[in-house]
């Protein structure tokens, strides 16, 4: 597994926070990207943002509900870190709503959320949400009620998803271990059991720095990828999915059949959650527009948007520390004029594309329930395909 150090191994379950980066990322393999990345090329390049993970991996063989195999986890994104009590302006959008992101009704109505933003598997949304409510009540705000933002993608191809292995303490640990700096990628956090374009999926991140009128603004993206059909996949414009259409396909190893594992999931069905952060001063309606650009980044990867895919996006701004002002009838906030947003939109598109590509590069082959195995995207063949289509850049 790339980009991850495990600080603890408990009863076969791997628990980790946001760890230092190790191993290659997409740029290291010569994948070309437009735009200037931040220092870590991660969502944490937006000052104050912290990311934490808990990755749960245990058991092997036949699926036994409640026992495993377990291939799942939790991801936490804290817009202003663990210590801040200040909400962030935010907006959300979807390009295909076959999924869930809690808290969006209230987010849409008031234009901000309290944080943290959590991502897990489809059937663990409730327990993670409840854990966050408890954390907010105990640690952050003495408020009357909370509506946390918790999103999901489906990991039932590899994970005992109906065994409910994600517990409140896992969500809390993801929050408590969240950190700034380099961010782990691949088979980590909520992304442990995911697939993407028929290869191993998971978690990825990227960022862009935009210069405007003598000022620098950063846009960071974190994705949990579980979407796309193999023939669609394009990397830097090269038809990687077509070139590898019959190779490295998911398979069942052992006595079980694929039918015993896929639970009727149609090809292309899956999901992607995209979290965007920026320090550019933007209001909720502008952040909703920013969130929409995730679909453009997905399109650069060749995605067409399948019927059963839950493609849900949220964007927030760390500017304007007086979002929730107490006292007074008027507050003053800063915002960028709409005619200055195009470069921010472009940065979000670029960072989304690179974050997804980083997932495919970082994620390792993983075997889960009933011996079902999802192969990693082979690095050498990716480079060969990029070279064939004259898209290979010098490795970073």
Swiss-Prot record:
GO biological process, one term: proteolysis
GO cellular component, one term: periplasmic space
Post-translational modification (record): Autoproteolytic processing to generate the alpha and beta subunit is required for self-activation and is proposed to use a similar mechanism as substrate cleavage.
Signal peptide residue numbers: 1-21
Active site, renumbered: 271 (nucleophile), 309 (proton donor/acceptor), 311 (proton donor/acceptor)
Gene3D superfamilies membership: L-amino peptidase D-ALA esterase/amidase
An MF annotation (GO) of this entry: aminopeptidase activity
SUPFAM superfamilies hit by this protein: DmpA/ArgJ-like
pH dependence: Optimum pH is 10.
InterPro entries: ArgJ-like_dom_sf, Peptidase_S58_DmpA
Catalysed reactions listed for this entry: Cleaves N-terminal beta-homoamino acids from peptides composed of 2 to 6 amino acids
Protein's cellular compartments: Periplasm
Function description: Beta-aminopeptidase that can cleave synthetic beta-peptides which consist of backbone-elongated beta-amino acid residues that are not processed by common proteolytic enzymes. Can cleave the beta-peptides beta-homoVal-beta-homoAla-beta-homoLeu and beta-homoAla-beta-homoLeu.
Binding partners and assembly: Heterooctamer of 4 heterodimers ((alpha:beta)4); each heterodimer is composed of an alpha subunit and a beta subunit processed from the same precursor.
Protein name: Beta-peptidyl aminopeptidase BapA
Organism: Sphingosinicella microcystinivorans
């Amino acid at each position: 597994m790339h980009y991850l150090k495990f600080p603890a191994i408990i009863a076969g379950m791997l628990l980790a926070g946001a760890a230092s980066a190790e191993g290659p990322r997409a740029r290291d393999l010569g994948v070309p990207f437009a735009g200037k990345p931040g220092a870590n090329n991660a969502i944490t390049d937006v000052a104050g943002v912290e990311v934490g993970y808990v990755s749960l991996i245990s058991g092997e063989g036949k699926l036994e509900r409640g026992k495993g195999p377990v291939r799942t986890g939790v991801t936490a994104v804290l817009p202003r870190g663990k210590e801040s009590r200040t909400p962030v302006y935010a907006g959300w959008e979807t390009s295909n709503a076959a999924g869930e992101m809690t808290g969006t009704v209230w987010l849409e109505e008031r234009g901000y959320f309290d944080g943290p933003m959590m991502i897990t598997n489809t059937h663990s949304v409730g327990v993670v949400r409840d854990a966050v409510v408890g954390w907010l009540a105990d640690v952050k705000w003495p408020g009357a009620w909370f509506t946390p933002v918790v999103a999901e993608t489906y990991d039932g191809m590899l994970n005992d998803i109906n065994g409910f292995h994600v517990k409140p303490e896992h969500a809390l640990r993801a929050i408590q271990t969240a950190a700034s700096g380099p961010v782990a990628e691949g088979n980590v956090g909520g992304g442990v059991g995911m697939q993407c374009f028929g290869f191993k999926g998971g978690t990825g991140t990227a960022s862009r720095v935009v210069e405007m009128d003598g000022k620098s603004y950063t846009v960071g993206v974190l994705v949990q990828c579980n979407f796309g059909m193999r023939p669609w996949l394009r990397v830097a414009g090269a038809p990687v999915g077509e070139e590898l259409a019959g190779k490295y396909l998911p398979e069942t190893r052992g006595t079980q059949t694929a039918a015993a594992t896929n639970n009727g999931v149609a090809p292309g069905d899956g999901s992607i959650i995209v979290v965007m952060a920026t320090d550019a001063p933007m209001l909720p309606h502008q952040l909703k527009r920013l969130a929409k650009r995730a679909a453009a980044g997905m399109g650069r990867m060749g995605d067409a948007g399948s019927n059963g895919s839950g493609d849900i996006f949220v964007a927030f701004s760390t500017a304007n520390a007086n979002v929730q002002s107490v006292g007074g009838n008027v507050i003053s906030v800063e915002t960028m004029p709409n005619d200055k947003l195009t470069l921010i939109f472009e940065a979000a598109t670029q960072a989304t594309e690179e974050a997804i590509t980083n997932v495919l590069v970082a994620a390792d082959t993983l075997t889960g329930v009933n011996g079902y195995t999802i192969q990693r995207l082979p690095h050498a063949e990716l480079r060969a395909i990029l070279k064939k289509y004259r898209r290979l850049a010098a490795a970073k």
